[in-house]
Amino acid sequence: MGRLVVVSNRIAPPDNKGGAGGLAVGVLGALKAAGGLWFGWSGETGNEDKPLKKVTRGNMTWASFNLSEQDYEEYYCQFSNAVLWPAFHYRLDLVQFQRPAWEGYSRVNALLADKLLPLLKDDDIIWVHDYHLLPFASELRKRGVNNRIGFFLHIPFPTPEIFNALPPHDTLLEQLCDFDLLGFQTENDRLAFLDSLSSQTRVTTRGSKSHSAWGKSFRTEVYPIGIEPDEIAQQASGPLPPKLAQLKAELKNVQNIFSVERLDYSKGLPERFQAYEALLEKYPQHHGKIRYTQIAPTSRGEVQAYQDIRHQLETEAGRINGKYGQLGWTPLYYLNQHFDRKLLMKVFRYSDVGLVTPLRDGMNLVAKEFVAAQDPANPGVLVLSQFAGAANELTSALIVNPYDRDDVAVALHRALTMPLAERISRHAEMLETIIKNDINHWQQRFIRDLKDVAPRSAETLHRNKVATFPKLA
């Protein structure tokens, strides 16, 4: 078996010394083990005609390219993030479909296939990541590539009622069948994909996870992404920076509810604020004795939907503090800024409650990081949305419906008053799962399964080859 070739929308620079998150950690671990290539967008626009930038370190090579302003707008902003992202997070009301954006999305996937093709070797295995690159295997197949190609979707896959509302849904489904292995975060996501596929064409299934559709054979499997628990525990348990140590001392008699999420409508942040207000309403005995800190750095600030949610959170935070605050006590701290990941792990460790309640999330690694950062002898309690992929694994968390403010409020009260023995027991069960299903286990399982797939024959490629771009009727 040859090299591993990883393809993602963005690549982590080889000289990046910062704390890498989910995808980067898993990809780097896999590439170091197998040797290979990481191919993706540089994050820069302009000078798109210049040659690929290549950097080699040992047995690993990074190859990156620039996008034109038009390609960036149509492929990334207008289709990936204004059509696929909201739809896959069950927000059809926020989808802004435009035909030029769909054509740009298709064009860039074809362009990327053209750029990668000269770099490929016959025995490479190719691992493609996330919703930006749904047509990528199809474009490679058109160019005669019969290598094993796997795909992992980091975000949820919506039900047919949602997915089939997208005008190019049928084309996207057929393109996905050009992958040999399709990986999902949860069983619900895998089944939602198969349900959407079955609504459009005849699907033949052998066993439970080997399928054929449109004359193409592929496998589906569930691979819940993990974290590096040992690394997080080490970051969390180290000495505190002076300002954080001072803050901890000042809050020694206050119970801390802590939450950190990217500012995104899928994270359920307004609902979180309302649930905290319900806690203050229902359980006045906590007044002056708790503090909820929400860190939510700006994401996609140029998009109106994200501007709206930022303004909503600022308004809600001011209203709640104005209603319940006292001299010397501010019940809610909302910080719209970025903090170093290592610092956040230390904050997790001294927090009494981790509040992770997205409305829809593929996995949510923050939930796993909170658990890994805790002191096993005196752990905090995780309150977790039933709609986060992590809820399928972290069953000892307090699982809540984020749309039910009273349900979340009751869970917060229970977390704040939970006896030490129960906290230790729940934490130990979750930590065991996180250690067992860490980031290395995730990537090793996926690559092992991809290697086990039989390569496609030249006859199959010729039969399925399409000469033109997909167009909407």
From Swiss-Prot:
Q: What InterPro entries does this protein's entry cite?
A: Glyco_trans_20, Trehalose_OtsA
Q: To which pathway does this protein belong?
A: Glycan biosynthesis; trehalose biosynthesis
Enzyme class (EC, first level)? transferase
- Look up the signal peptide feature and give its range: none
Q: Which GO terms describe its molecular function?
A: alpha,alpha-trehalose-phosphate synthase (UDP-forming) activity
* GO-annotated biological processes: trehalose biosynthetic process
Which positions in this protein are listed as binding UDP-alpha-D-glucose? 21-22, 262, 267, 339, 365-369
Tell me which Pfam families the record gives. Answer: Glyco_transf_20
The superkingdom listed in its UniProt entry is Bacteria
> In the UniProt record, does the keyword Zinc-finger occur?
no
EC number(s) per UniProt? 2.4.1.15
- Ligand binding (D-glucose 6-phosphate): 10, 76, 130, 300
Keywords for this protein: Glycosyltransferase, Transferase
Indicate yes or no for the key word Transferase: yes
- List the residue(s) that the UniProt entry marks as the site Involved in alpha anomer selectivity: 85, 155
Write out the catalysed reaction.
D-glucose 6-phosphate + UDP-alpha-D-glucose = alpha,alpha-trehalose 6-phosphate + UDP + H(+)
Assembly information from the UniProt record: Homotetramer.
Similarity comment: family membership: Belongs to the glycosyltransferase 20 family.
State its role.
Answer: Probably involved in the osmoprotection via the biosynthesis of trehalose. Catalyzes the transfer of glucose from UDP-alpha-D-glucose (UDP-Glc) to D-glucose 6-phosphate (Glc-6-P) to form trehalose-6-phosphate. Acts with retention of the anomeric configuration of the UDP-sugar donor.
Task: List the protein's name.
Answer: Trehalose-6-phosphate synthase
Per the UniProt record, the source organism is Citrobacter koseri (strain ATCC BAA-895 / CDC 4225-83 / SGSC4696)
